[in-house]
Amino acid sequence: MAFDISTILLVAEIALLIPTLLLIILGRREEKGRQTLLREITNTARMVSRQEYFNNVQFGMQTAMKSIRGAVTGSNPRNAEQDEIIKSIEDQIRRARKRGVSVEYLLLKSPDRLQIANRYHAAGAEVRFHSSLIVSDVRYVVFDTKYVLIGLPSSVGANNPTREGYLIPSEGMAEIFLHQFNTKWAEATRYDEYLAEILSEAKSHSPNASVELLSSQLQIPAEEVKRVLATQRIG
């Protein structure tokens, strides 16, 4: 059954979000459920700017009472502004964990994601890696199964920064994204396991590589390299 795209375009200027959402929706085979979900999207979605997007990230993390679950790019900051955003997220992770809030992040499985993964992990988040995330098209965070904050890049590409986003205060949408998140989470590689895998591979190619060299190459603290090498008995 064809979806009424013109109606969606008229409501909240959500055209950029539709392709990705359709991938999620089409995974749910119930035709009636898809129709209901699309109606809910058009009724509740609100487009937000880049600054509003990160303001909403901050607000959501500050007010979350039970859980924060996100699939994000995890790409390294390119300038001071982006680094400040990462620092503020680290701070909110620490605050959330002190309140007993569960914080889980999925990142694309790639060595160049280890720096941000390490920073979030050190702040108290549980981090895993998956090789087939859709963060090149969309990145999202679900707060307390109440609403979803979806970020869109300036152009397709897993390293492109978030340009704008959509705030969807909908438990129904939150459940859809959580289902997708939980499926990937169950398949994903834990932070320590992936870091150990990368270090083991590096050591196999360069057995004499120093901790300092590995730290520099992976852009993570030397202490973290030592910890994983010791716990995993690598080298």
Place the predicted regions along the sequence by residue.
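Short acidic, S/G/P-rich loop/turn micro-motifs used as interaction or catalytic elements
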Residues: G74-Q82, S110-R113, G172-A174
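HKD (HxKxxxxD) catalytic microenvironment of the phospholipase D
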Residues: R128-I176, F181
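Short amphipathic alpha-helical interface segments
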Residues: Y194-A209, K226-R227
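Residues in the recognition helix of alpha-helical DNA-binding motifs
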Residues: E224-Q232
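PLD-like (HKD) phosphodiesterase/transphosphatidyltransferase domain
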Residues: S6, P19-Y105
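DNA-contacting interfaces and partner/effector-binding or oligomerization modules
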Residues: V103-I134, L152
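The alpha-helix within a helix-turn-helix
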Residues: S215
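Feature marks short, highly hydrophobic, charge-poor N-terminal signal-anchor/signal peptide-like helices
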Residues: M1-I14
